[in-house]
Regions:
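Positively charged n-region of N-terminal signal peptides that target proteins for export
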Residues: 1-4, 18
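Sec-dependent N-terminal signal peptides
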Residues: 4-13
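Residues that define the transmembrane beta-barrel architecture of outer-membrane proteins
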Residues: 24-28, 62-70, 83-85, 108-116, ...
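Residues on the lipid-exposed face of transmembrane beta-strands in outer-membrane beta-barrel proteins
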Residues: 30-38, 66-76, 91-93, 116-124, ...
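Predominantly the C-terminal beta-signal and adjacent terminal strand-loop region
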Residues: 41-47, 56-58, 167-237
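Outer-membrane beta-barrel translocator domains and adjoining extracellular loop/strand segments
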Residues: 41-52, 97-107, 141-155, 206-214
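Repeated loop/turn-to-beta-strand initiation elements of outer-membrane beta-barrel proteins
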Residues: 78-87, 126-129, 187-193, 235-237
Length: 237
């Protein structure tokens, strides 16, 4: 008797779940973000660091760089036709610039990365808010240094492959977080074009490289803001 009641209750639960979340299903899509990056630099010297060393690695102020990318999302959405929650895997390519400046110098650390993360999103009607977190794995770095002396600009550009990154960074793995907002324009029940905006940050870059003496901490980070466009395919909102 108890087993029969349990089976009946389970059947009703399945029916209720299907009816309540009739718009649930798998989703796929891609996203193209384009925006600005504001770099931040922080260094802490050891007590025995000479002044000439401190002057060479002095603190820099924030400057503006350029970010872009192409990411692909896949995951599952649970919804009732009006609101829902989706959990997406977010994988792709990102171009990230950390820009900083001093009195007579500007520096740009430009990374080409593979991006791996997750993107939970909360949907209501045509609107969606997301919070992404993950890592970026660099496969190339271009470091550009612009110096100014007597109103004359000099520029030096150095390219580093993935095997050479440890000469610049103790740990070149980038951690990122990202808040996004987008609006869906539906072309059909299962296809929508997305327009939105984002704000986020990249951090955890230890820029000590091979020169680990005299420096206890030398970190790069950035604040990223921009717009994004994408395409969404699948069932649900």
């Amino acid at each position: 008797m108890k087993r029969t009641i349990f089976i009946i209750a389970l059947i009703f639960s399945i029916i209720f779940t299907k009816e309540s979340f009739g718009s649930s299903g798998w989703q796929f899509g891609f996203n193209i973000p384009i925006g600005a990056s504001f770099g931040f630099y922080k260094v802490r010297f050891s007590s025995d660091a000479p002044q000439t060393y401190k002057d060479n690695y002095a603190e820099r102020k924030s400057s503006v760089g350029f970010d872009a990318g192409l990411t692909f999302q896949t995951g599952y959405l649970i919804g009732d036709g009006e609101k829902g929650i989706s959990l997406l895997v977010d994988v792709g390519y990102s171009h990230d610039t950390f820009a900083i400046r001093g009195t007579d110098i500007k520096e740009y650390y430009t990374f080409e990365n593979m991006q791996l993360g997750i993107l939970p999103k909360f949907h209501k009607g045509n609107y969606a808010v997301g919070f992404g977190i993950g890592i970026k794995i660099p496969f190339q770095l271009i470091h550009t240094s612009e110096t100014y002396a007597n109103n004359v600009k000099s520029e030096t550009t150095t390219k580093y492959s993935v095997d050479q990154l440890d000469s610049v960074f103790k740990d070149a793995l980038i951690t990122y977080v990202k808040f996004s907002f987008d609006y869906s324009f539906y072309l059909s029940d299962k296809i929508a074009v997305l327009f939105g905006a984002y704000i986020g940050g990249d951090f955890n870059l230890d820029a000590r490289g091979a020169e680990k003496i005299y420096v206890e901490n030398r970190n790069l980070s950035s604040l990223d803001v921009g717009l994004q466009i994408g395409l969404k395919l699948g069932n649900g909102i």
